[in-house]
């Protein structure tokens, strides 16, 4: 029986690895979309000697130092600049960094799963990120290699959980780096505070005091990456511009950078339930299964004080609070759109850990009696079936024909890039925001928006017919003379 289980485990592990490879390969060839292109302007400008600056397409269409509208931070974009400095292809080279973080995310979940509830928990946890569906809206996560900050932030949060029991200071630093991958990672702090409290010895006020003693250094270190970034911004911009930068950052954080019709909590929860490659009711049922197993496990260990139990409770409590912070904020933030990208760092980091907690709960129940011993595995099998269904759905989605791919974009942009090089055109204006952004960045020109004052007299790239003279044309895009 043990041999059969071992064979089954490794066959399933190999199948899951194959699914990851298929999704990664599909993601590398996916359309280079506007948010990725907007992010790529920062490492390009840094290498061009213009500083840590975007093209400012959403900030007046001028070179903008430490642009607050770039929500993907230096934790991601500085490594991208390092890769590009060695002459790597701009798009594929840039996408290697999120891919590295994706691998780190899966590896961290495997470590947590193995440590907490054995190899089967590790396998299920490694499947959860594949089950998440970031597509389906105008601001997607297309896959593991998108040049965005959500996956890197999630990976760093997971590794913070890995090191927290023995190196809380390092966990704090990793959380700080996650914040500088995506500012929304700040919402993870309450979860880590609760995790530290669970690990602290004593009871009552003594435990709170111990938590404060253990938590001050990680909290300080969590702020170090952001402090360094803002110090660099101060010396790059000067006092007056730095104050404007802070105001812009505060405005962006408060407003989410979007102006949409107010959304409701039911709409948000419905969107989250639909963000998996299974029907929403299956996603909800899976969540209920996880909660039942976790609660059952916690009830089963009442009165036990083993270190292994405390570590499991730490993970469950910290991840539950972390997940609630992300989903709760997003659900109640009426000014934010129905984009699962917003809570994605918390979903990708903490939901898989809660699945680990569910498997741990099943194991704890197995020690309580015949009924619990039979019920736990049945619920885990149902949980596993849901994940298998979702992962297969993700793999099947990669076979759906795409209207545009990275390869087709390259072919469309080739004549425009050649024209930009020959004419030395420094800027092109995108008309409108959206599909026209990425071709401009791929052409090698700086990108602005057609209606910005700074773009007066600048040629415009569009997918529509030109109303002025056509300067150069590809199969999908063309450059029109300035009106």
PLM features per residue range, with description:
Residues 14, 92-117, 159, 295:
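Transmembrane-helix motifs of polytopic, lipid-linked glycan transferases
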Residues 19-22, 185, 327-333, 357-359, ...:
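Transmembrane alpha-helical segments
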């Amino acid at each position: 029986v043990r041999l059969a289980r071992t064979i089954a485990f490794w066959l399933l592990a190999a199948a899951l690895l194959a699914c990851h490879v298929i999704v990664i390969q599909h993601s590398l060839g996916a359309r280079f979309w506007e948010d990725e292109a907007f992010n790529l302007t920062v490492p390009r400008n840094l290498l061009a000697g213009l500083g840590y600056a975007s093209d400012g397409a959403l900030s007046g269409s001028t070179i903008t130092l430490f642009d607050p509208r770039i929500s993907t931070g230096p934790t991601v974009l500085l490594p991208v600049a390092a890769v590009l400095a060695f002459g790597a292809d701009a798009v594929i080279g840039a996408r290697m960094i999120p891919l590295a973080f994706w691998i780190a995310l899966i590896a961290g979940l495997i470590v947590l799963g193995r440590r907490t509830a054995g190899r089967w928990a590790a396998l299920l946890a490694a499947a959860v990120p594949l089950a998440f569906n970031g597509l389906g809206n105008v601001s997607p996560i297309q896959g593991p290699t998108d040049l965005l900050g959500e996956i890197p932030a999630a990976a760093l949060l997971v590794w913070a959980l890995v090191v927290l029991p023995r190196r809380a200071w390092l966990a704090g630093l990793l959380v700080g780096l996650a914040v500088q991958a995506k500012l929304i990672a700040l919402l993870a702090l309450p979860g880590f505070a609760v995790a530290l409290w669970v690990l602290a010895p004593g009871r009552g006020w003594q435990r709170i005091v111990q938590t404060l003693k253990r938590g001050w250094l990680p909290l300080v270190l969590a702020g170090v990456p952001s402090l360094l970034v803002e110090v660099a911004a101060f010396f790059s911009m000067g006092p007056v511009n730095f104050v404007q930068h802070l105001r812009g950052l505060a405005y962006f954080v408060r407003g989410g950078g979007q102006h949409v019709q107010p959304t409701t909590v039911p709409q948000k929860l419905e969107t989250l339930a639909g963000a998996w490659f299974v029907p929403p009711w299956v996603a909800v049922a899976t969540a209920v299964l996880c909660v039942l197993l976790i609660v059952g496990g916690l009830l089963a260990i009442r009165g036990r004080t083993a270190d292994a139990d405390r570590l499991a409770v730490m993970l469950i409590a910290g991840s539950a609070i972390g997940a609630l912070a992300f989903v709760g904020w997003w659900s109640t933030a009426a000014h934010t759109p129905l984009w699962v990208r917003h809570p994605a760092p918390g979903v990708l980091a903490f939901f898989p850990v809660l699945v680990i907690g569910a498997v741990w709960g099943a194991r704890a129940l197995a020690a309580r009696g015949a009924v619990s011993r039979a019920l736990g595995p049945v619920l885990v099998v149902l949980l596993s079936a849901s994940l298998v269904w979702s992962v297969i759905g993700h793999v099947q989605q990669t076979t759906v024909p795409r209207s545009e791919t990275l390869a087709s974009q390259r072919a469309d942009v080739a004549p425009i890039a050649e024209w930009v090089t020959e004419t030395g055109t420094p800027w092109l204006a995108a008309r409108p925001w959206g599909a026209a952004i990425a071709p401009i960045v791929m052409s090698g020109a700086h990108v602005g928006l057609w209606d910005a004052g700074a773009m007066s007299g600048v040629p415009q790239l569009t997918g529509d017919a030109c109303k002025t003279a056509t300067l150069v044309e590809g199969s999908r895009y063309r450059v029109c003379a300035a009106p």
